[in-house]
Structure formats: C-alpha cells, structure tokens
Design a protein with these regions (language model features):
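Hinge/lid segment of periplasmic solute-binding proteins
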Residues: 102-158, 186, 194-196, 214-215, ...
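Glycine-centered hinge/linker elements that transmit conformational signals in sensory
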Residues: 186-191, 229-258
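Short, solvent-exposed loop/beta-turn-alpha elements that line the ligand-binding surface or hinge
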Residues: 118-134, 178, 195, 201, ...
Length: 357
C-alpha cells in the first residue's frame, strides 16, 4: 500500500476523532541589539528527524539575528528527556522549549513548573494564535484533564505496519494486499519465517508502551483506568491479555522478533525482517536507509473491532523563567509551527502536522 494513501487515511481518521503564521520580527530586541539565547530540548536522534531539527534551528537563527537557539538531543526518547528535565530544573537550569511526549502530559503537568502558554502568547502580543490556528480537539491533545493548556501540539503520530514487499513476494504474500487484522499478521509472520528464513514481525518497545496501548485498546482493553479519582493500571483484563498474547505467540513460534528498537529497525532496513509496527514518524528514515521500496498499511484490527489509536508524537512546552527568554521561546514556537517549518518537519520525519489548513 502506498505511503501517501496511509498518510491520508491516518490523518483523516486521527484529526476527525482527536483532530498543518509567519515568523515574527522580534522588533523589540532588534531595537536594543540584545541577543537572547534559548535552549531547545528534543528527542530527535539522527535516525529520527535529528537532521531536520538542525536545519530548522539553523534557519530560525539565520532569520532571527537577535535570538540564538541551541538545540539539545535527549537519548532514550521521552523517558530520558523527562529524567534530564527533572535534574536540570532541580539545579535551576531550565531549558526554554521542550518536546514533551503526549503520554507524559499529566506527569509533566503535575511535576514541572511550566510557563502558561495563554499568558505567554498574550505577553508576546499574539493571544489568539492558538485559537486561530488549531482546531479545539487538536489543542486538547496538549491539555490536562481539567482543561489546562500546558503545551502546543507539534508532532502527531499514528502507529502503522511497515513491510518489505520483496520479502512478501518471496513468502508468496501479496504486497498489494497487506495484513489488515492481527490474525492475518500472525499468519503472514509465520509464512515469512517458514518460506524465507527471515523474521516475520517486530513491534517497537519504547518505554511509553504507545503501540502496546493501541494494541490493547483496539481489542477492547484499557491501559489505564480511574478508580475513586485515582488513575491506576487497567490492563489486567482478558481483552488486554488476549491482545498481548498475539505478539507473545509470534515470539514463541520464532516468527516474532523480541529485541531492542534499534535492533528491530536495523533488521527491517537490512532486509531480514518482513514487518515492523512503529510510528509513521519513522517513514523518512526507513525510506532513506532501506534498499527496497518501503511500504506501509494502517494499524491492524482485531477482527471487526474498530481500531483505537492513542495520539502519539509530542507537544511543545515552555519552561523559561526570564521574561525575555519567554518571548524568544514563543517566537521560536511560532516558527516551528509555521506551515513552512511544519512541511519540512513532516517531510523529514513522517509526522502529521497539527495546524488547520
């Protein structure tokens, strides 16, 4: 299945249920000649949009001579970033703009002293920026349960099933008719292993358990539940167990790969793995690194049950304590969220853009 069709389908479904401004002139700093330096923390490794981050930062710095953005990559995705953020804030060395994963939203709201974006945009003279450029249900992606807007949606991701059409053909599978259900994925994985000797399937295993959440909830289970006002683990159910069993059975019969993320992704890129379930944000890296035509299909379903996909990706938070740094941070965020910059980010990663129009 062509990736353009997958992108179109996933964007429509995601933005329908949970839902792509020009750069400012920074006139005040231009008048004073003062240069403000801010830090931008992200999780984009070189294989996951890192080059695009550097390109965007360089472009912003070139067009905003009175602001200097210094980017910092944080390993181990959002778990590593959150740990580093805790340490930095404990020592009083706040970064200014941070990519925060949606799955860490409530934790960030409860444990970090962040800058109120509504107040920050108002102070920057653009209090209607969020309302004018984002659908209400998209803004909700970066809101707490009580409606606090703690950040601005930036990267919107969905899990998809990438596959190698050459391995499919060798296994007598039709690349134009990829698996649509988990039963079909299991059968295809076994067929790939039996006929080609290659591993059949791998599911990303990041610490936030995002794809596992999609797996569980698509089978009628829950990752979390609320009891007496407190959020607790909710995956101890028959539906959740049955969902996990699908992947466990593939590993048990030798057709499923249980490995680190980098090992799994490299197996796919090197032509030793038939299918990998991961974020659409890996698209650009896969297309660049693979020697075969990368193909993808939507996240598989459990029979006729509707798939339930939690929003993945990240939103932008501001932690600046200094007023001038806050203004510079907002200027940088407006640039990152501009149609031109979002187009570069989407092309360099595969993420879906959050803006209207």
């Amino acid at each position: 299945m062509k990736l353009k069709k997958v992108l179109a389908a996933t964007m429509i479904s995601l933005l329908a249920t949970t839902a792509l401004v020009g750069c400012g002139s920074d006139k005040k700093n231009a008048d004073t000649g003062k240069k403000v330096q801010i830090e931008y923390w992200h999780v984009a490794a070189e294989s996951f949009g890192g080059a695009t981050v550097k390109e965007l930062v360089a472009d912003f710095n070139k067009t905003h001579p009175n602001i200097e953005v210094v980017e910092k990559y944080n390993p181990d995705m959002y778990k590593g970033l959150t740990q580093n953020l805790q340490a930095a804030m404990a020592s009083g060395k706040n970064p200014d703009v941070v990519q925060m994963g949606y799955s860490f939203l409530n934790y960030a709201a409860e444990n970090f002293k962040y800058t109120d974006l509504n107040e920050a945009f108002k102070a920057a003279g653009d209090e209607n920026f969020m309302k004018d450029n984002y659908l209400p249900n998209v803004l909700q992606l970066a809101q707490t349960e009580d409606g606090k807007q703690i950040g601005l949606p930036y990267s919107v991701s969905v899990p998809v099933l990438f596959y190698n059409p050459e391995i499919f053909e060798k296994a007598c599978l039709d690349p134009q008719n990829p698996p649509k259900t988990w039963e079909e994925v299991s059968k295809a994985a076994k067929q790939i292993k039996d006929k080609t000797g290659n591993m059949g399937f791998f599911m990303q295993e990041y610490a936030d358990n995002w794809t596992q959440q999609a797996l569980i909830e698509s089978n009628g289970g829950q990752m979390l539940t609320k009891v007496d006002g407190k959020v607790k683990a909710g995956f101890d159910t028959p539906e959740s167990a049955a969902a996990y069993q699908v992947v466990a059975d593939m590993v048990k019969n030798g057709s499923g790969l249980h490995a680190t993320n980098e090992e799994g992704f490299q197996a796919y890129l090197s032509g030793k793995l038939g299918m990998v379930c991961t974020t659409i944000g890996k698209r650009a890296n896969f297309e660049k690194g693979a020697k075969f035509k990368v193909m993808a299909s939507p996240f598989p379903a459990f029979g006729n049950k509707p798939t339930k996909i939690p929003a993945g990706g990240n939103f932008l938070m501001v932690f600046s304590k200094d007023a001038e740094k806050q203004k510079a941070a907002i200027e940088f965020i407006k640039y990152l969220e501009s149609p031109e910059a979002l187009a570069k980010w989407s092309t360099g990663t595969g993420y879906l853009p959050p803006r209207k129009g």
